[in-house]
């Protein structure tokens, strides 16, 4: 029962400061008998303070998760463990294996504009408040196009994000002042972008927070905040059934966080995709 935890810093009294993701690290550290800390120099110590580590109590003593806006911090910036559980610290310098996505094209730009127009219309109708609502977005070139369109639409005010992952496009919108705050479980950004965040942490410190996945993806919090979820579909039918994870029933293309945790609990749930795939040979509407 050994946990291996990546960190940017560890202290003699058992404080572990995580790097670019929260995941299930707090739970793993609590349950493990022994902990090996991977002290990764590829992640700057400037990451200290980026995380908000919180674990709910077990029933019957569990209370609500007291997050009432995306920027709320309810825990600690580190994982506290018994120092006796830490049996080793291994020093590494290994960057994340981040990948970039294809640039936007006329098709993805049009999808993005359609979403922006839809949300702007809902805001005019009073379905969405004039201050807007927090967004959750998946990752990929379509998601980038949607976020780009929302950022360019000046009828939509600067907004917050309560999401599972934050990608490069969100960081750009934060720098431009179009995203006021981003709450997520992980930073899924390119290494250059991540280094830029670390180098400019004085700017980002009050604009980003990383949480454990059971908090970032909590149905309770998603419902309370009135999150608008935007995820990519592989195929959908006219009855509203959406496949956003598998191709051919066996090849997994996407995780289930967006579809499983956010879509089912969001105030407004949106799926985006082109109408056809494989150069028009396969319909995405089945």
What are these regions (language model features)?
Residues 1-286:
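Conserved alpha/beta enzyme-core scaffold
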